[in-house]
Amino acid sequence: MRIVFQGDSITDAGRDRRNYFDMGNGYPKYVSEMLKKEFPNAELELINLGISGNRTCQLFDRLYPDAIALEPDVISILIGINDIWHRHDVDRIETTNEQIAVNYRAILTRLRNRTQAKIVMLAPYILD
């Protein structure tokens, strides 16, 4: 089973980007450790493709070269923190709530149309 983690710095979590099997120190690492412990005989391929600083529009742009092309069984996405957080930076372009919703729908639509993967969409905790 191939599981791909996509997102921003919360997913990236300091991973070594030269090695996409490096889980970093965030939730992908803990999920990976739990899965390996719970299913020790399962053939798991766990890939972290989080990129620190990414926004929803950037994740959308890299869905094919990153996640879809890998033909994962499961895609876990946690994105949106930077869309919200950077509203407070004077020199950043603001992403409205409406645009974030449009981007989320576009991400889900592209994944549903281009892959058979199960999608696990995690809400940015700042939105909960």
Named regions from a protein language model:
Residues Y30-E45, Q58-D128:
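Alpha-helical cap/lid subdomain in secreted, periplasmic
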Residues M1-S52, Y64-E71:
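Serine-esterase "nucleophile elbow" of acetyl-processing enzymes
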